[in-house]
Amino acid sequence: MRLGLCVVALVLSWTHLTISSRGIKGKRQRRISAEGSQACAKGCELCSEVNGCLKCSPKLFILLERNDIRQVGVCLPSCPPGYFDARNPDMNKCIKCKIEHCEACFSHNFCTKCKEGLYLHKGRCYPACPEGSSAANGTMECSSPAQCEMSEWSPWGPCSKKQQLCGFRRGSEERTRRVLHAPVGDHAACSDTKETRRCTVRRVPCPEGQKRRKGGQGRRENANRNLARKESKEAGAGSRRRKGQQQQQQQGTVGPLTSAGPA
């Protein structure tokens, strides 16, 4: 009799423990499920009770908002002002612009739109356009004056010396750039550009005809110089002769003084 009562007591105790454990397990599952449904907002695939959304749907962007000392993830269809969208195969993100006073940016260090009242110049925001630039067409974007549009450098020309291509070893060669387009109303600001450098070539004798022409030209130049010297000397001698003649004439006209009296 006692043995039967003990068996019944053990069976009842085991049944009670089983029911209790099932109830606790069911309560835990319901609590986790409830917390998950409250933390994950629409468009969020993975979330945390502490940090909000951890992963958004493929077409949405995740933005980390600061809440006291925590960062909470939020899923958005587009990034707010001051952020730019960074698309990634894993997850699209909104990244804050690092440029001061920037409202929209292309990357973290290149602004595309400044806050109201500020001027945009080369991806930065300024209270006024920097020196050498001005706002274009009433906008808030600064631009530098139009530059001269030049052609590419031409190939280097032949090595020459005094317009000769022979009879020397060291000479010079040059190349040029031409104006393709000048700023409107300021054509004087642009001009063709020439660049010269020294060159060394193997000495090539000049053809006989060119030598004779060169020699004849040299003789003519020497003859002209000699003629000029001769004319200069003759002019100097003539000037001295004329001066001597004038002095003699002056001495001949001056005679002794005589006094006039009654005969």
Swiss-Prot record:
Effect of R70 to C/E: Strongly reduces activation of Wnt signaling
Segments annotated as FU repeats: 34-85, 91-135
GO biological process, one term: regulation of receptor internalization
Result, substituting N137Q: Secretion of RSPO1 is decreased. Increased Wnt/beta-catenin signaling-enhancing effects
Outcome of mutating F106E: Abolishes activation of Wnt signaling
Disorder: Keratoderma, palmoplantar, with squamous cell carcinoma of skin and sex reversal: A recessive syndrome characterized by XX (female to male) SRY-independent sex reversal, palmoplantar hyperkeratosis and predisposition to squamous cell carcinoma of the skin.
Cellular compartment(s): Secreted; Nucleus
Subunit note: Interacts with the extracellular domain of FZD8 and LRP6. It however does not form a ternary complex with FZD8 and LRP6. Interacts with WNT1. Binds heparin. Interacts with ZNRF3; promoting indirect interaction between ZNRF3 and LGR4 and membrane clearance of ZNRF3. Interacts with LGR4, LGR5 and LGR6. Identified in a complex composed of RNF43, LGR5 and RSPO1. Interacts (via FU repeats) with KREM1.
Stretch forming the signal peptide: 1-20
Designated name of the protein: R-spondin-1
Residues glycosylated per entry: N137, W153, W156
Role noted for this protein: Activator of the canonical Wnt signaling pathway by acting as a ligand for LGR4-6 receptors. Upon binding to LGR4-6 (LGR4, LGR5 or LGR6), LGR4-6 associate with phosphorylated LRP6 and frizzled receptors that are activated by extracellular Wnt receptors, triggering the canonical Wnt signaling pathway to increase expression of target genes. Also regulates the canonical Wnt/beta-catenin-dependent pathway and non-canonical Wnt signaling by acting as an inhibitor of ZNRF3, an important regulator of the Wnt signaling pathway. Acts as a ligand for frizzled FZD8 and LRP6.
Outcome of substituting Q71R: Strongly reduces activation of Wnt signaling
GO cellular component, one term: extracellular space
